[in-house]
Structures are given as structure tokens and as C-alpha cells.
Amino acid sequence: MTKTILFISPTGTLDNGAEISIVNLMKFLVKKGYRVLNVFPDYKVPSQEEYQVELQKAGIETYGLSAVKWWWEEAPGGSPGNHFLRVNSYNKNVKDIRNIIVDNKVDLVISNTVNVFQGALAAAFEDVKHFWLIHEFPEGEFGYYKEKLDFIDTFSDEIFAVTGALTEDLEKCFPNRKIYSFAPYTQIEPKEGVKTESNDQHRIVSVGRLTQRKNQLELIKAFQMLDLAGTELVFLGAWDEDYKQLCDDYIAEHDLKNVSFLGYLDDPWSEITDKDLAVFPSSMETFGLVYVESVLNGIPTILSDN
């Protein structure tokens, strides 16, 4: 009999590694014969329409739920509306997820971020197994969830964390249970070889969203110290406006040359050549999807040990 798995999405978009990774996992599970459902917060933005289309093409059933705030009260994202509206929204979301579980005879609920709790509660109410996939260190903007550890422990049949330092951290947070680890799931097909560049121009490249946690400003400072004549530093990916401004200000203040930002690309790896070196200087990140993709594409890669 076909098993049905319900995933709870953090954002319902394809602009972050956690979502891309688990979309790849959901597609894989569909190919293995599972029935896969997905619930996401529906904010009626174009990027979510693209998300739905991508999932539906893969045979994944999607449910967009209206939400005042989807993440925990204390999680990043501010405090939209007021406390009363947020509590009512949380309650409605839990009820809606319970209905989805019952109507579809769901066998397993998986929350794809520590930042959402609705699926955990709904699964408990309906006596269905619940797994938690955690991508975030309990530090900085996600430090709030240290206060949620008892809840997470109580409402998880199993806890999975991104392999490496995060798994080690969570083993200390949950000393009485096993923490399983996973590497980000990728659908990339390893290439015979990256694009060959006819000249000898070398570049340092960094793929991924420009954010404080990913720490690209530190790479810009290192590039300045290296002072390599003729070498370019290229960033491929969208950005947080405030952090991009910090980077722009530093570049202008120090009159740095040969630094460029190419923005979001559907296939950033198609822009990489055999003369490039990939560098990922994250200060507070897990073992990310871009690391896996970089290695699978045969790119020499340097990444921070954080």
C-alpha cells in the first residue's frame, strides 16, 4: 500500500537551500512510489506560484495556507498583525493541517525547518509520526529555539540535522536521543567537465544568496588582502538589500576593482569554468547545498569550518 508523506515548507519558494534540497527529496520520493504532499504559507507572491508549478509538475500535491505569521512568534520575520491575529492564524493552520492529514490518510509528517511547529502539533493530535529536519544552528537569529528544545523533543519521533557541526551541536542539546544526520539533497547531474576557458584568467567565485550568515563581506576583505592582479571576484546569487549595501559601501570605500555581483541565475554553475575557484566563507551555516553542487561539478572548493 502506498505510503503518504506530508512535508511542511518553511517559505514555499525556491530561493533558499533548505527548500531546494527538500524539493529534490520530495521528487525522489515520488519516483520511489510514495505519495507526497506539501503545505506552505501562501502569501500570494509570484515566487510561490513558481514553487507550486515546480512541485505539481513533479507529481507533488500542494496546499497553500494563509498565515499572518508562519514561523514561531520569536522567529525572524517580525510581528505582523497583532498577537491575537497571530494566535488565531496559528490555530487555524494547525486545524487545516489536521484536516489534510485525516483527508489524505497521511502516514508521516516532516517539518523542513526548526522554525515551524504547526505540523508537529497536527501530527500529535492525529497520532501520526512526525520527523523534524533542522537546518539552523541555535545561534544568532535562530538562538530563540534553545527555549523550544523540550517541545521539539516531545513532538518529534525522530530528529534529523544537517551533517557536520550542526549534528554535533544538537547531540549536546538532546543528550538522551539519537540525532540523525543528512546532507542536502541535490538533483544535479555530474558533468563530464566544467566549461573550458580558452584564456588563463582565474576567478574566485561564490554561489548563493548574499547574507550576513553567509559572510561574503569577509571574502571581499580577503580578496583585498590577496591583491591578485587580473583576478576577479564574482558573486552569483540574489541578496539581502541591507547586506548588499554593506558590501557595496566597503568596495567603494576601499576602491576595490574586479568585484562583481551577477544576481540570481537559474543555473549558476553554467557560468563556472575550469579556471575558477569556489569559496564559501559562511560564519553560521550548515553543510549547504551549494557545497555539494560545487564538488559534484568538479570545482576546486574552499569552505569555512564553522
Predicted segments, located by residue:
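A conserved mid-protein helix/loop that constitutes part of the nucleotide-sugar donor-binding site
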Residues: 16-24, 202, 211-225, 245
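A structural motif in glycosyltransferase catalytic domains
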Residues: 22, 29, 204, 219-222, ...
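Short hydrophobic beta-strand element within catalytic cores of glycosyltransferases
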Residues: 300-304
